[in-house]
C-alpha cells in the first residue's frame, strides 16, 4: 500500500492509527469486511479465480462452499449459540425476518421452530415485518437475517423491535452490517460464491446448529415430537405410496 501511495510504510501506519485503528492488520481486516458488506453479484463473479471450463467452475463452487463452512466451524462460539438457543423456549413469540433471497432462510427456521411447538412467525415482506414487529415486547425474540449491507426492510424491522424491547439476534456475514450494530447478538456465516448468486451453505449450517441446540434444551419434548413425526411419516396421507 505504501508503494501505491508513494510514501513509506511508517507513514501509512501513522495514518492508519490516526484513523483509530490499533495497527495495519486491523485496518486490513476492516477493509476486508467493507468489501464483503458492499459486494455485488458482479463483484463475486469477477473476483472468482478462473476455472478450467464448466466442470472446473463446479469444483470451485464446491470448494468455496467448503471454505465458508470451515470458516463457520472455526469462528462460531458454540457456547454463546447454546445460551442463545435457551431463550427460544422462554420467548412469548419469535419473529424471524428475512426478505428477498433470505426469505428462504427465514421460512426454513420458522418451519423447524413451529415443528418444535414454538410460537414462531416468518416475516418475509416489508408489510409483514412492519406489522409483526409493531407488537413485539421484551418477552419476544426477533431473528433478523440479511447479508452484505442489509436490506432496508429488515434493518428497519430490527430498529423497531429493539425500540420495543425485543431481544434481537442477527444472522449476517460481516460485523459491518447494520444488523450487527443494532442487535443484542450476532452470528456470522459467509455467503461467498464464484457465481452471480449468494451461497447459503454456511447460513443453513448455522441455522441447523441453532435448531439442534434449541431442541436439545428440552430433549424429552423434542423426542416425543420426533416420534409423532415418525408415525406421520410412516402412515400419513400426504406421503406418496405406490
Give the residues covered by each predicted segment:
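Short, charged beta->alpha transition segments
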Residues: 56, 79-84, 128-132
Amino acid at each position: 500500500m505504501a508503494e501505491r501511495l508513494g510514501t513509506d510504510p511508517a507513514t501509512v501506519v501513522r495514518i492508519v492509527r490516526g484513523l483509530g485503528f490499533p495497527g495495519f492488520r486491523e485496518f486490513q481486516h476492516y477493509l476486508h469486511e467493507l468489501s464483503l458488506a458492499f459486494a455485488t453479484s458482479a463483484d463475486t463473479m469477477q473476483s472468482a479465480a478462473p476455472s478450467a471450463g464448466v466442470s472446473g467452475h463446479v469444483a470451485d463452487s464446491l470448494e468455496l462452499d467448503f471454505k465458508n463452512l470451515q470458516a463457520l466451524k472455526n469462528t462460531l462460539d458454540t457456547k454463546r449459540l447454546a445460551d442463545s438457543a435457551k431463550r427460544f423456549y422462554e420467548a412469548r413469540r419469535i419473529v424471524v425476518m428475512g426478505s428477498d433471497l433470505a426469505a428462504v432462510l427465514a421460512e426454513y427456521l420458522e418451519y423447524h421452530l413451529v415443528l418444535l411447538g414454538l410460537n414462531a412467525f416468518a416475516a418475509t415482506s416489508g408489510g409483514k415485518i412492519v406489522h409483526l414487529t409493531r407488537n413485539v415486547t421484551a418477552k419476544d425474540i426477533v431473528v433478523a437475517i440479511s447479508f452484505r449491507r442489509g436490506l432496508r426492510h429488515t434493518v428497519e424491522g430490527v430498529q423497531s423491535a429493539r425500540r420495543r424491547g425485543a431481544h434481537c439476534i442477527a444472522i449476517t456475514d460481516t460485523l459491518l452490517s447494520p444488523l450487527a450494530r443494532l442487535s443484542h447478538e450476532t452470528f456470522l456465516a459467509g455467503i461467498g460464491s464464484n457465481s452471480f448468486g449468494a451461497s447459503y451453505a454456511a447460513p443453513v449450517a448455522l441455522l441447523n446448529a441453532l435448531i439442534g441446540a434449541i431442541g436439545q434444551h428440552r430433549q424429552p419434548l423434542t423426542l416425543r415430537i420426533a416420534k409423532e413425526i415418525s408415525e406421520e411419516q410412516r402412515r400419513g396421507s400426504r406421503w406418496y405410496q405406490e
